Every structure is written in C-alpha cells, then in structure tokens.
Amino acid sequence: MTLALDIPLNDTQFSAQRKSEVLVEALPWIRRFQGRTVVVKYGGNAMVDPGLQQAFADDIVFMASVGIRPIVVHGGGPQINAMLAESATPVEFRNGLRVTSPEVMEVVRMVLVGQVGRQLVNRINAYAPLAAGMSGEDSGLLSARKSRVIVDGEQIDMGLVGDIVDVNIDLVISMLDRGQIPVIAPVSPEVDAAGRPTGQVLNVNADTAATAIAQALRAEKLVMLTNVAGIYGTWPDPHTLISEVSASDLRAMIPRLGEGMRPKAQALLDAIDGGVSSAAIVDGRIEHALLLEIFTTRGVGTMARSDDYV
C-alpha cells in the first residue's frame, strides 16, 4: 500500500505535480479515443489570434501523436470580411445576410484555400509533415447543392451558397490511414439533382460542412470551436451553462432556449441524429480548449451525447 504524505511542496514541485495529475486524468480518454475519428470545426477567435492559432495547432498535433484521427474543417469569416473590404469587392445584403456573388465567391475561395488553410497547415507541419490542406473541390471530396434560405416565410436567393449532399469518405479514410491530417476548406462543387457537376462552386458554412463530414464518417466526436462558452439554458446567465446533455433531453430543451442558442443546440443534435457519438461546442477563446474538451472528465463546453453513449 502506498501512503500519500502531507509534504509541503515548493512552487516548482507543485507545478510538476499538477502536470502529472493532468496527464493521469487524460489517460482513460486517450485510450477511449485512440484510433477513433474526431472532426473539429476551427473558427471564431481561435482563427485570428496568433497565440490561439498556435495553441490549436499544438492540440491537433497532440491528438494525432496519441493515435487519434483528427480532421479539421475551417471557416474564415473575419479574414473574408477583411479581404472583401481591402479589395473593395461589391457586396449585396438581403434581409441582413450577405449574398455570395461570383465576385465574392472568388474572394472566399482565395482566402479559405490560399490563406487560412495554408497558415494552419504550416503551423501543424512545423512539428512534422502531417497536415494536408484541401478543399471540397479536390478529388470530389465534397458535393453541394444550393441552399434554400427562408426568411419570414419568403425564399431568399443568397447566391452561391450551398449545403453538403455527399462526402467522398474513401478519400478521407485513405488519408487518415496514411497518418495524414485533412485540413478542409468547405468550398464545394455544385451538383444537380442527378449528382452531375454543374461547373459551379458553392460556399458552404463550415459548421454544416463539419457536421456532414462527421456524419458521413460516423465520427466518434465532433467539436466546434466558437466564441461562446457553450449552450446556456438562460442566455447570458453563466450559471445556466449546460455541461452535458443527452440527445433526447436536448431535443426537448431546444424550443425553450433563446434564439441565439437554438442554432448551436440544433447543430449538436443534427450531428448526434446523424450517427456521431458525441458533439460539443467549446470556447475557442480559451487556449487549448480542444485538449480540455477531449482529455478531461468535465470538458470545457457543452457536450451532447447519444442516448446510449457510455
């Protein structure tokens, strides 16, 4: 039997002890997720703050190093807005929503693939050549169809905006099997009702793209980085932050949530309904939020789980 002695520790020893406790807490979660696929939506402040960018890259490399199969799907809203302003690209708004014209689409494509994706790949590959940047256009990775946006009962044409209708899972799985980390920009080729390419490219929301990819792969977990701490029962009361919820409880809860919380809650529920074991919204403003969510018992945001999740 080992006795724990009450020995006073200096600052260095205390810090070392805390680090060892973190590693011990992580061990069962490392074993649980080893060999499993985790899809991460990269967005919010984590994309624009250099310190948070590096922390996110560190987290992804750590996940891969312990045998997890991460996939990153990234947005780029702040960078796209900055480039549109800098290039003086004409932008039209309908009912407060930005229309993706062909001119805007060119900026979206350039920023997501050539800027945001490349920067993240470079940060990850500073450790080892692990990450491969790509878009939905590459090798038929994603197929999309134009979105139907309804505002106040009226259908609004938002231009070149789409929803994912198909994922080339064989391509993604082959990359994961080779030890690669796919870093995906969700610009995707449009297909018609018969699945034939139209020659047009659509801008797809990163949240919905990440959810579609996680569903297609039946991922173990989907994690979405945002600029909020999670889902609140009563926004913005911090005491009502929901740490964990079953799919059935979340389904019953959604009609009672505030308008700002409902889309986030619905995104988690959609992932679970599509076969993902658990889905979480975490605060991307916290350094290493991804590791805290995956490798600690309490996590750091709101996790929704299937009703039979163990």
UniProtKB/Swiss-Prot annotation:
Pfam families: AA_kinase (PF00696). GO terms for cellular component: cytoplasm. The keyword Transferase applies. One of its GO terms (biological process) is arginine biosynthetic process via ornithine. Substrate binds at residues 76-77, 98, 203. GO terms for molecular function: acetylglutamate kinase activity; ATP binding. Keywords: Amino-acid biosynthesis, Arginine biosynthesis, ATP-binding, Cytoplasm, Kinase, Nucleotide-binding, Transferase. Its EC number is 2.7.2.8. The record marks 41, 264 as: Transition state stabilizer. The keyword Membrane does not apply. InterPro entries: AceGlu_kinase-like_sf, AcgluKinase_fam, ArgB, Asp/Glu/Uridylate_kinase, Glu/AcGlu_kinase, NAGK-C. Its main location: cytoplasm. It is an enzyme of class 2 (transferase). It comes from the Bacteria. It catalyses: N-acetyl-L-glutamate + ATP = N-acetyl-L-glutamyl 5-phosphate + ADP. Pathway: Amino-acid biosynthesis; L-arginine biosynthesis; N(2)-acetyl-L-ornithine from L-glutamate: step 2/4. It is found in: Cytoplasm. Catalyzes the ATP-dependent phosphorylation of N-acetyl-L-glutamate. Belongs to the acetylglutamate kinase family. ArgB subfamily. PANTHER family: N-ACETYLGLUTAMATE SYNTHASE, N-ACETYLGLUTAMATE SYNTHASE, MITOCHONDRIAL. NCBIfam families: argB (TIGR00761). This is Acetylglutamate kinase. It comes from Cutibacterium acnes (strain DSM 16379 / KPA171202). The lineage of its organism: Bacteria, Bacillati, Actinomycetota, Actinomycetes, Propionibacteriales.
